[in-house]
């Protein structure tokens, strides 16, 4: 019998010492510990020599006594790594490895019986040199390995020992988890799996946040595009508030050409009917405020040296820079008309009108195309709002109603127009109350006030008075001619 569980090397003179203790000790655990300790003490081996002997093995042939069978049972049931029962020493795998054949597999912890090819020896052990076998002792009784196996099979074994043996020999997960190394590996695997789950959760959260950011960006881009289409960018004044100083505008000729059309203050191009109705209610001289008529053509003011449309297109197509437009105060407008040359740009009057109720200033040009800024102030002081939300009672201008609908998740496709004739009449009254200077400037065709100069001229020359009186009489007749033109628009 080969006891690989001890991992010790011995010679033939040590075997009687070992078997002498087999019949003294009745405790199996004490027997194993005492055999190993006494064996090491008797040989007086150093640590280095003992480490070299760990790769050797012990070969013992035992009898079928009770103590021997108990020792074999203990070795089998308590999990020694390398333990086997062979019929002869020649059948040991180490001899096959020594002869140069393939390396043997490590024997399992079971008692296997093989056919008896040769008669077994009574006591055989491996010396330091395997090529010199040791003769057996003749005093010991010979016992075959078959009897040992039969005694092991017929001997009553406690249920606990059988369960331990099955747990040791079976390849189930519980057996693998019984060792600390397996538990540590399992713990590492669980930790890695937990980390992977956490990483997956974080990745999903990042993807969700990125999708939310993209959705918000797209929503803002769409809102900006819609606001641009409704003319919300025109809420802010495009001109400098310092109306008393001469400034240079960066607007191109195309901006000036499209400037009279941008008068809806967020109402969109589809609100021509509202603009025409307000034109009908107001005096015809206010028509240029809605971008419908030209004030200079109406009142016969001095024509401005503007370039024709064909020449303007040619200059734009050739890539030449368009002429800059100078903005002058009202008092300097007439002087600039007489003194400027052909190469100068278009000159416009830039004046600021303050609300008579709240004092809010509003800057406009000579064409009156920014009248929507005045309308914004009028809407503040008026209780009548032109548009209403489809889903609630919120009222206001079109841009405010659409913004409210988007914030409240209401129908934001278009605002509900609730304009009536009473509202238009009230807005007309509010215009005269808030901006009387604007009304007077429109009535005189954006000409500067020359009341004192006219009085002096009346005293000096009566002919000039007659001419001025004829001009004053022509103004209402010309306005009456414009009324049929404004009525079809309604």
Curated annotation (Swiss-Prot):
Region (PEST): 101-110
Chief location: nucleus
Effect upon mutating residue 368 to E: In lin-26(mc1); embryonic lethality and the death of many hypodermal cells
Gene3D superfamilies, per database record: Classic Zinc Finger
Residue runs in coiled coils: none
Compartments reported by the entry: Nucleus
Gene Ontology biological-process entries: ectoderm development; epidermis development; establishment or maintenance of epithelial cell apical/basal polarity; gonad development; positive regulation of transcription by RNA polymerase II; regulation of cell fate specification; reproductive process; vulval development
Region of interest: Disordered: 96-176, 236-262, 302-326
Ranges of Basic and acidic residues composition bias in the record: 236-260
Highest taxon of the lineage: Eukaryota
Protein name according to UniProt: Transcription factor lin-26
């Amino acid at each position: 019998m080969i006891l690989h569980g001890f991992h010790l090397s011995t010679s033939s003179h040590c075997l009687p010492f070992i078997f002498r203790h087999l019949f003294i000790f009745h405790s199996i655990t004490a027997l194993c510990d005492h055999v190993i300790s006494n064996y090491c003490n008797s040989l007086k081996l150093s640590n280095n020599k003992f480490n070299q002997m760990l790769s050797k093995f012990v070969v013992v042939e035992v009898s079928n006594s009770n103590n021997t069978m108990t020792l074999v049972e203990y070795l089998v049931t308590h999990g020694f790594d390398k333990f086997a029962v062979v019929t002869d020493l020649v059948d040991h795998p180490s001899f096959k490895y020594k002869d140069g054949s393939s390396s043997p597999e490590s024997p399992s912890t079971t008692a296997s019986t093989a056919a008896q090819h040769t008669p077994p020896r009574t006591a055989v052990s491996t010396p330091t040199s395997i090529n010199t076998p040791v003769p057996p002792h003749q005093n010991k009784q010979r016992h075959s390995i078959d009897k040992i196996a039969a005694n092991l099979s017929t001997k009553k074994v406690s249920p606990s020992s059988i369960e331990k043996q099955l747990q040791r020999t079976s390849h189930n997960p519980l057996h693998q988890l019984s060792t600390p190394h397996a538990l540590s590996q399992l713990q590492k695997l669980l930790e890695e799996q937990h980390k992977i789950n956490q990483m997956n959760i974080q990745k999903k959260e990042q993807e969700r946040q990125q999708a939310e950011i993209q959705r918000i960006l797209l929503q803002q881009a769409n809102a900006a595009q819609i606001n641009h289409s409704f003319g919300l960018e025109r809420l802010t004044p495009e001109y400098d508030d310092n109306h008393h100083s001469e400034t240079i505008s960066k607007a191109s000729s195309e901006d000036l050409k499209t400037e009279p059309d941008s008068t809806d203050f967020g109402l969109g191009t589809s609100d021509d009917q509202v603009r025409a109705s307000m034109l009908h209610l107001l005096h015809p001289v206010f028509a240029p405020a809605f971008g419908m008529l030209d004030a200079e053509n109406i009142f016969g003011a001095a024509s401005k040296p503007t370039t024709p449309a064909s020449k303007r297109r040619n200059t734009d197509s050739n890539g030449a820079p368009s002429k800059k437009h100078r903005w002058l105060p009202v008092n300097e407008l007439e002087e600039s008309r007489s003194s400027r040359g052909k190469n100068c740009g278009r000159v416009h009057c830039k004046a600021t009108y303050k609300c008579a109720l709240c004092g809010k200033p509003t800057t406009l040009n000579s064409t009156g195309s920014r009248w929507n800024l005045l309308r914004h102030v009028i809407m503040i002081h008026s209780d009548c709002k032109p548009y209403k939300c489809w889903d609630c009672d919120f009222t206001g201008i079109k841009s405010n109603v659409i913004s409210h609908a988007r914030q409240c998740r209401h129908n934001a496709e278009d605002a509900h127009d609730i304009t009536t004739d009473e509202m238009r009449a009230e807005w007309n009254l509010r215009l005269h109350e808030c901006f009387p200077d604007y009304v007077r400037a429109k009535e005189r065709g954006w000409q500067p006030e020359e009341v004192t100069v006219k009085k002096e001229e009346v005293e000096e020359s009566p002919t000039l008075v007659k001419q001025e009186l004829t001009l004053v009489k022509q103004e209402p007749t010309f306005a009456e001619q414009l009324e049929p033109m404004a009525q079809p628009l309604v």
